[in-house]
């Protein structure tokens, strides 16, 4: 991130930078979406087949309307992918990333049946925390801001008015006492560190104050004072300490997203005490003396910490008091940081919307138990994610994107969707065949051999783990190079299997759920769906369409459904695929397009050889201390590789490395 981007610029325009022009049916999709936005329609659905360039279409919409934009994805990996794609297309604008800032998070919980209290355990990721702060700051200072977020965007943040009131603008010639500046820095979450330039820290030597902001990498500000007046402001590189620029003004934002307002701290603590007195009376009247004692002890300890330091462990549980919200009032969230005219894009809406719906009830159920048994005050219930109705009340105009939109979003638009099913590569939706289950395994083996002759690969999806294990073992007995992809595999192992499938180390991968990200491999030309006619999540219409789409990147893409009857879901999926395929064929014929398999480079390995050796070494070490040191060394190596992958815009590898780091951190914590 360039240092200039931390400066206040009120109303920049988006500039889409790309060597591509809209092709296929992207133009008509862009026109229809644009028209609906101009007409102020709240809901739109972009039904985009796999590989048709939905992100590119959305980028054109954002650029045309110059509105702040929120893009919500259902997990960190997809959010990271979208972030890097949009960042590449909008290099001169603010593209931000907002996900959970924890590498590891175990929420506070109590299990009454076992009388087991589980304390909150977490490991914060400073890099992600920095990116969250950057997103908040950008939304409050820049019109040309795109934030790519997970559902973390729906969890509680500080009131944006309170947060922005903590901004301080420093100018050359401004009168300010050194102690006033240092006091503001401490109250805004900065920590003093005269030795190391850490994110969210400051140093003070004589009349020179150096501030390392918490929202941008490798940059710090040197404020030189003379006789209670700012004499000069310089931007410096935090690593080399070299001067980057001499500036006249800078806006410094808080180092944390939750800042306790000092002038209101006394009132906040009194309000917490009043609630405590009321709740203790309730518990004592119900003869819950143990719960009352527990609550009093815990809350008073938190109050002492709040009054002394302006902070306490689990401060988020007092967020309604910090924000002066009434009981039941919704929390402030990232959406409150947007201006009054922003656009929302819900990616993979058939997955993301159900996830948003479920968050509130899951969170409330856990916290009700904590309140009932005296671990938390009732106001802790108001530290929560938005419920679905609240989310809907905050979004202005929204585009739902999916290859298989859900019934909810389809009903919102009366099934009048904007279609985008022509691929720039000319690739057609896969052919589909239905075959009887009699001798199905022999038939699959024959298909595997045919694909192997063409140097192509095969996916096989079953309904149960047992079926996958048995089928994998049987194929191995037949000397077929096969791997089993299951949920217990660690991120790195899963990625290495898929990489080896592409290389030809394996010819087949067997699994239960082949709907996860990272499975769109151009070498895979056949997907075999066992028990295709059975009812359930993995064999409903949307899952079948998504599974068929696993082979849509190969010109010979084909799906074989093994079933003795044709279920309604099968019938709908086949009809929809054939409908799309017909449109695609007609378009190719009209424009003389010859479909071709997507070309995608195969990386030699996700990990460097050095990191592989260190990881293998760690597994063999029995001494606990030495093992922890080796794991930490591996984590440090992986962080370097992850940052390098991010710089090279290899977001798939960067995401895999990040997940591997999280797994190793968890392993280190349990040793």
Swiss-Prot record:
One of its GO terms (biological process) is nucleotide-excision repair. ATP binds at residues 48-55. Its main location: cytoplasm. Disulfide bonds: none annotated. It is found in: Cytoplasm. The keyword Lipid metabolism does not apply. Residues 440-602 form the Helicase C-terminal domain. Residues 35-423 form the Helicase ATP-binding domain. GO terms for cellular component: cytoplasm; excinuclease repair complex. Belongs to the UvrB family. The beta-hairpin motif is involved in DNA binding. This is UvrABC system protein B. It comes from Mycoplasma mycoides subsp. mycoides SC (strain CCUG 32753 / NCTC 10114 / PG1). The gene is uvrB.
């Amino acid at each position: 991130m360039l240092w200039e981007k931390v400066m206040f610029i009120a109303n920049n325009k988006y500039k889409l930078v790309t060597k591509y022009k809209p092709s296929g049916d992207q133009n008509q999709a862009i026109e229809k979406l644009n028209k609906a936005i101009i007409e102020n329609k709240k809901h739109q659905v972009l039904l985009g087949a796999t590989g048709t360039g939905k992100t590119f279409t959305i980028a054109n919409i954002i650029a045309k309307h110059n509105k702040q934009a929120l893009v919500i994805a259902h997990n960190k990996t997809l959010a990271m992918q979208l972030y890097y794609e949009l960042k590449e297309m909008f290099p001169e604008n603010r593209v931000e990333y907002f996900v959970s800032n924890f590498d590891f998070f175990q929420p506070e919980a109590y299990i009454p049946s076992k009388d087991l209290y589980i304390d909150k355990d977490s490991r914060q990721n400073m890099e992600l925390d920095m990116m969250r702060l950057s997103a908040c700051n950008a939304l409050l200072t820049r019109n040309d801001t795109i934030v790519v977020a997970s559902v973390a965007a729906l969890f509680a943040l500080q009131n944006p008015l309170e947060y922005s009131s903590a901004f301080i603008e420093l100018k050359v010639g401004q009168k300010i006492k050194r102690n006033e500046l240092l006091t503001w820095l401490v109250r805004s979450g900065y920590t003093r560190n005269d030795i190391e330039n850490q994110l969210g820290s400051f140093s003070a030597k004589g009349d020179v104050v150096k501030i390392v902001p918490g929202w941008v990498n490798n940059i710090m500000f040197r404020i030189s004072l003379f006789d209670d007046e700012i004499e000069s402001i310089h931007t410096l590189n935090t690593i080399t300490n070299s001067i980057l620029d001499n500036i006249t003004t800078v806006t410094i934002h808080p180092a944390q997203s939750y800042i306790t307002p000092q002038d209101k701290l006394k009132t906040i603590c009194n309000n917490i005490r009043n609630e405590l007195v009321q709740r203790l009376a309730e518990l004592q009247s119900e003869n819950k003396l143990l719960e009352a004692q527990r609550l009093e002890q815990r809350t008073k300890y938190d109050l002492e910490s709040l009054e002394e330091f302006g902070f306490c462990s689990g401060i988020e549980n007092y967020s309604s008091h910090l924000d002066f919200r009434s009981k039941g009032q919704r929390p402030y969230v990232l959406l409150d940081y947007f201006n009054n005219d922003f656009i929302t894009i819900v990616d993979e809406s058939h997955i993301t919307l159900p996830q948003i719906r479920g968050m509130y009830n899951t969170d409330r159920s856990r916290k009700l138990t904590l309140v009932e048994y005296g671990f938390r005050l009732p106001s802790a219930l108001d530290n929560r994610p938005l419920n679905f109705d609240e989310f809907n009340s905050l979004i202005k105009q929204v585009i739902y994107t999916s290859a298989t939109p859900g019934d909810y979003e389809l009903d919102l638009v009366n099934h009048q969707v904007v279609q985008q099913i022509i691929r720039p590569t000319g690739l057609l939706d896969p052919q589909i065949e239905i075959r009887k289950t009699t001798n199905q395994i022999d038939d699959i083996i024959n298909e595997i051999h045919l694909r192997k002759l063409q140097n192509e690969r095969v996916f096989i999806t079953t309904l149960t783990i047992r079926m996958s294990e048995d089928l994998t073992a049987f194929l191995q007995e037949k000397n077929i190079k096969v791997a089993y992809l299951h949920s217990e595999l660690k991120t790195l192992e899963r990625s290495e299997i898929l990489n080896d499938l592409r290389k030809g180390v394996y010819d087949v991968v067997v699994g239960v759920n082949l709907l996860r990200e990272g499975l769109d491999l151009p070498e895979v030309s056949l997907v075999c769906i066992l028990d295709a006619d059975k009812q359930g999540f993995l064999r409903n219409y949307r899952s079948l369409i998504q599974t068929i789409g696993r082979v849509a990147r190969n010109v010979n893409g084909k799906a074989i459904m093994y079933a003795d009857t044709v279920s309604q879901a099968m019938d709908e999926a086949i009809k929809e695929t054939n409908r799309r395929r017909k449109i695609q064929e007609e378009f190719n014929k009209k424009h003389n397009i010859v479909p071709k398999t997507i070309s995608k480079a195969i990386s030699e390995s996700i990990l460097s050889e050095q990191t592989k050796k260190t990881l293998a070494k760690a597994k063999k070490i029995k001494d606990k201390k030495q093992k922890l040191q080796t794991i930490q060394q591996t984590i440090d190596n992986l962080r370097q590789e992850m940052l390098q992958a991010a710089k090279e815009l290899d977001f798939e590898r960067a995401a895999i490395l990040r997940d591997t780091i999280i797994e190793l951190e968890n392993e280190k914590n349990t040793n």
